[in-house]
Amino acid sequence: MNISKVLILETLYELLLNGQTNRVSLVRLQADVNDHPMTKQLAHQWQTLKINDILDVIKLLFPKQTSLSDGQIIFYNLQIVEIRDTLLDVVRECQDTLVKDVKQLEQQYQAIKSHDDMKIRRERIMGMYRDTILAKLQSFQHFHRLYSKLDPSPVVRDMMDLERIKATSIENLSHLQHILQKCVTDSVMTTKAGSDRYREIILSQGELDDTVKFVRYAMDN
Protein backbone atom coordinates (compact mmCIF):
# COMPACT_ATOMS: atom_id res chain seq x y z
CA MET A 1 0.00 0.00 0.00
CA ASN A 2 2.78 2.47 0.84
CA ILE A 3 4.50 1.83 -2.49
CA SER A 4 1.21 2.60 -4.24
CA LYS A 5 1.01 5.87 -2.32
CA VAL A 6 4.53 6.82 -3.37
CA LEU A 7 3.86 6.11 -7.04
CA ILE A 8 0.56 7.97 -7.06
CA LEU A 9 1.86 10.98 -5.14
CA GLU A 10 5.01 11.32 -7.21
CA THR A 11 3.07 11.09 -10.47
CA LEU A 12 0.39 13.46 -9.21
CA TYR A 13 3.01 15.96 -8.05
CA GLU A 14 4.71 16.01 -11.46
CA LEU A 15 1.42 16.37 -13.37
CA LEU A 16 0.17 19.25 -11.23
CA LEU A 17 3.55 20.96 -11.23
CA ASN A 18 4.01 20.72 -14.99
CA GLY A 19 0.40 21.57 -15.79
CA GLN A 20 0.18 24.55 -13.45
CA THR A 21 -3.40 23.58 -12.65
CA ASN A 22 -5.47 22.12 -9.82
CA ARG A 23 -6.98 19.29 -11.85
CA VAL A 24 -5.67 16.04 -13.31
CA SER A 25 -7.15 13.55 -15.75
CA LEU A 26 -7.70 10.24 -13.99
CA VAL A 27 -6.93 8.31 -17.18
CA ARG A 28 -3.65 10.19 -17.58
CA LEU A 29 -2.80 9.71 -13.91
CA GLN A 30 -3.50 5.98 -14.11
CA ALA A 31 -1.44 5.61 -17.29
CA ASP A 32 1.54 7.50 -15.87
CA VAL A 33 1.45 5.56 -12.60
CA ASN A 34 1.42 2.21 -14.39
CA ASP A 35 4.20 3.38 -16.75
CA HIS A 36 6.37 4.54 -13.87
CA PRO A 37 9.89 2.99 -13.90
CA MET A 38 9.37 1.63 -10.39
CA THR A 39 6.15 -0.06 -11.50
CA LYS A 40 8.07 -1.81 -14.29
CA GLN A 41 10.77 -2.95 -11.86
CA LEU A 42 8.10 -4.47 -9.62
CA ALA A 43 6.13 -5.95 -12.52
CA HIS A 44 6.73 -9.55 -11.36
CA GLN A 45 4.99 -8.84 -8.02
CA TRP A 46 2.81 -5.88 -8.90
CA GLN A 47 -0.78 -5.64 -10.08
CA THR A 48 -1.73 -2.78 -12.40
CA LEU A 49 -3.45 -0.02 -10.44
CA LYS A 50 -7.02 0.71 -11.44
CA ILE A 51 -8.66 4.14 -11.32
CA ASN A 52 -10.64 3.18 -8.21
CA ASP A 53 -7.39 2.17 -6.48
CA ILE A 54 -5.92 5.58 -7.25
CA LEU A 55 -9.05 7.40 -6.08
CA ASP A 56 -9.05 5.48 -2.79
CA VAL A 57 -5.47 6.57 -2.09
CA ILE A 58 -6.11 10.22 -2.97
CA LYS A 59 -9.27 10.38 -0.84
CA LEU A 60 -7.37 8.81 2.04
CA LEU A 61 -4.51 11.30 1.83
CA PHE A 62 -6.53 14.41 0.99
CA PRO A 63 -10.02 14.03 2.46
CA LYS A 64 -12.50 16.84 1.72
CA GLN A 65 -10.04 18.48 -0.68
CA THR A 66 -11.04 16.77 -3.92
CA SER A 67 -13.97 16.31 -6.26
CA LEU A 68 -14.61 14.51 -9.56
CA SER A 69 -15.79 16.17 -12.76
CA ASP A 70 -15.74 14.84 -16.34
CA GLY A 71 -13.10 12.20 -15.61
CA GLN A 72 -10.87 14.65 -13.80
CA ILE A 73 -9.97 14.94 -10.15
CA ILE A 74 -10.03 18.52 -8.88
CA PHE A 75 -8.11 19.70 -5.80
CA TYR A 76 -9.34 22.50 -3.54
CA ASN A 77 -7.27 24.55 -1.10
CA LEU A 78 -4.29 22.31 -1.71
CA GLN A 79 -0.85 23.74 -2.35
CA ILE A 80 1.63 21.83 -4.48
CA VAL A 81 4.04 21.90 -1.56
CA GLU A 82 1.51 19.94 0.52
CA ILE A 83 1.62 17.11 -2.00
CA ARG A 84 5.42 17.19 -1.92
CA ASP A 85 5.47 17.10 1.89
CA THR A 86 2.94 14.27 1.95
CA LEU A 87 5.07 12.38 -0.57
CA LEU A 88 8.16 12.79 1.61
CA ASP A 89 6.23 11.60 4.68
CA VAL A 90 5.06 8.48 2.86
CA VAL A 91 8.59 7.81 1.58
CA ARG A 92 9.93 8.03 5.14
CA GLU A 93 7.14 5.73 6.27
CA CYS A 94 8.15 3.25 3.56
CA GLN A 95 11.77 3.45 4.62
CA ASP A 96 10.87 2.84 8.27
CA THR A 97 8.72 -0.13 7.31
CA LEU A 98 11.49 -1.59 5.15
CA VAL A 99 14.04 -1.14 7.93
CA LYS A 100 11.74 -2.95 10.37
CA ASP A 101 11.11 -5.74 7.85
CA VAL A 102 14.84 -6.15 7.20
CA LYS A 103 15.59 -6.28 10.94
CA GLN A 104 12.87 -8.87 11.43
CA LEU A 105 14.25 -10.96 8.57
CA GLU A 106 17.76 -10.66 10.03
CA GLN A 107 16.49 -11.86 13.41
CA GLN A 108 14.71 -14.79 11.77
CA TYR A 109 17.85 -15.62 9.80
CA GLN A 110 20.03 -15.47 12.91
CA ALA A 111 17.59 -17.71 14.78
CA ILE A 112 17.64 -20.26 11.94
CA LYS A 113 21.42 -19.99 11.61
CA SER A 114 21.92 -20.43 15.36
CA HIS A 115 19.64 -23.47 15.30
CA ASP A 116 21.53 -24.93 12.34
CA ASP A 117 24.91 -24.21 13.96
CA MET A 118 23.75 -25.84 17.17
CA LYS A 119 22.48 -28.84 15.22
CA ILE A 120 25.80 -29.18 13.39
CA ARG A 121 27.78 -28.93 16.64
CA ARG A 122 25.52 -31.50 18.28
CA GLU A 123 25.89 -33.88 15.34
CA ARG A 124 29.67 -33.45 15.49
CA ILE A 125 29.75 -34.14 19.24
CA MET A 126 27.47 -37.16 18.89
CA GLY A 127 29.73 -38.43 16.11
CA MET A 128 32.73 -38.12 18.44
CA TYR A 129 30.91 -40.07 21.14
CA ARG A 130 29.94 -42.73 18.61
CA ASP A 131 33.51 -43.11 17.36
CA THR A 132 34.88 -43.14 20.92
CA ILE A 133 32.52 -45.90 21.98
CA LEU A 134 33.21 -47.96 18.87
CA ALA A 135 36.97 -47.59 19.34
CA LYS A 136 36.69 -48.69 22.95
CA LEU A 137 34.50 -51.65 22.06
CA GLN A 138 36.97 -52.69 19.35
CA SER A 139 39.66 -52.92 22.01
CA PHE A 140 37.68 -55.55 23.91
CA GLN A 141 38.06 -59.27 23.42
CA HIS A 142 34.51 -60.20 22.53
CA PHE A 143 32.30 -57.34 21.38
CA HIS A 144 34.26 -56.28 18.29
CA ARG A 145 33.92 -59.78 16.85
CA LEU A 146 30.23 -59.63 17.59
CA TYR A 147 29.41 -56.62 15.41
CA SER A 148 32.34 -56.46 12.95
CA LYS A 149 30.27 -58.48 10.49
CA LEU A 150 26.99 -60.23 11.05
CA ASP A 151 25.90 -62.98 8.72
CA PRO A 152 22.44 -62.52 7.15
CA SER A 153 19.71 -64.48 8.87
CA PRO A 154 15.97 -64.89 8.21
CA VAL A 155 15.47 -64.66 11.98
CA VAL A 156 16.62 -61.02 12.20
CA ARG A 157 15.49 -58.07 10.12
CA ASP A 158 17.66 -55.02 9.40
CA MET A 159 20.93 -56.41 10.76
CA MET A 160 23.66 -53.95 11.78
CA ASP A 161 27.39 -54.24 11.11
CA LEU A 162 30.39 -52.08 11.98
CA GLU A 163 30.50 -50.01 8.78
CA ARG A 164 26.80 -49.27 8.98
CA ILE A 165 27.10 -48.19 12.61
CA LYS A 166 30.00 -45.88 11.75
CA ALA A 167 27.88 -44.16 9.10
CA THR A 168 24.84 -43.73 11.36
CA SER A 169 24.02 -40.23 12.64
CA ILE A 170 23.05 -40.71 16.25
CA GLU A 171 20.61 -38.45 18.08
CA ASN A 172 21.96 -39.10 21.56
CA LEU A 173 23.85 -41.66 23.59
CA SER A 174 20.69 -43.68 24.22
CA HIS A 175 20.18 -43.96 20.47
CA LEU A 176 23.68 -45.39 20.01
CA GLN A 177 23.19 -47.70 22.97
CA HIS A 178 20.01 -48.98 21.35
CA ILE A 179 21.87 -49.69 18.08
CA LEU A 180 24.68 -51.53 19.85
CA GLN A 181 22.25 -53.42 22.03
CA LYS A 182 20.55 -54.58 18.85
CA CYS A 183 23.85 -56.15 17.78
CA VAL A 184 23.85 -58.22 20.95
CA THR A 185 20.19 -59.15 20.55
CA ASP A 186 20.63 -60.05 16.87
CA SER A 187 23.56 -62.30 17.76
CA VAL A 188 21.57 -64.01 20.48
CA MET A 189 18.77 -64.65 18.00
CA THR A 190 21.12 -66.20 15.44
CA THR A 191 23.39 -68.23 17.73
CA LYS A 192 22.90 -71.66 19.27
CA ALA A 193 22.56 -71.47 23.04
CA GLY A 194 25.51 -72.96 24.92
CA SER A 195 27.96 -72.62 22.02
CA ASP A 196 31.30 -70.82 22.35
CA ARG A 197 29.95 -67.89 20.33
CA TYR A 198 26.91 -67.72 22.59
CA ARG A 199 29.19 -67.38 25.63
CA GLU A 200 31.10 -64.61 23.84
CA ILE A 201 27.81 -62.80 23.26
CA ILE A 202 26.96 -62.94 26.96
CA LEU A 203 30.41 -61.56 27.83
CA SER A 204 30.07 -58.84 25.19
CA GLN A 205 26.94 -57.58 26.94
CA GLY A 206 29.05 -56.77 29.97
CA GLU A 207 31.61 -54.99 27.77
CA LEU A 208 28.86 -52.88 26.25
CA ASP A 209 27.37 -51.97 29.63
CA ASP A 210 30.79 -50.96 31.00
CA THR A 211 31.53 -48.82 27.95
CA VAL A 212 28.20 -47.00 28.11
CA LYS A 213 28.73 -46.30 31.81
CA PHE A 214 32.21 -44.98 31.08
CA VAL A 215 31.00 -42.59 28.37
CA ARG A 216 28.04 -41.39 30.43
CA TYR A 217 30.40 -40.63 33.28
CA ALA A 218 32.68 -38.72 30.90
CA MET A 219 29.73 -36.71 29.57
CA ASP A 220 28.55 -35.78 33.06
CA ASN A 221 32.01 -34.66 34.13
Swiss-Prot record:
GO terms for cellular component: nucleus. It comes from the Eukaryota. One of its GO terms (biological process) is chromatin organization. Keywords: Chromatin regulator, DNA damage, DNA repair, Nucleus, Transcription, Transcription regulation. InterPro entries: EAF5 (IPR026226). Coiled coil: none annotated. Its main location: nucleus. It is found in: Nucleus. Component of the NuA4 histone acetyltransferase complex. Component of the NuA4 histone acetyltransferase complex which is involved in transcriptional activation of selected genes principally by acetylation of nucleosomal histone H4 and H2A. The NuA4 complex is also involved in DNA repair. Belongs to the EAF5 family. This is Chromatin modification-related protein EAF5.
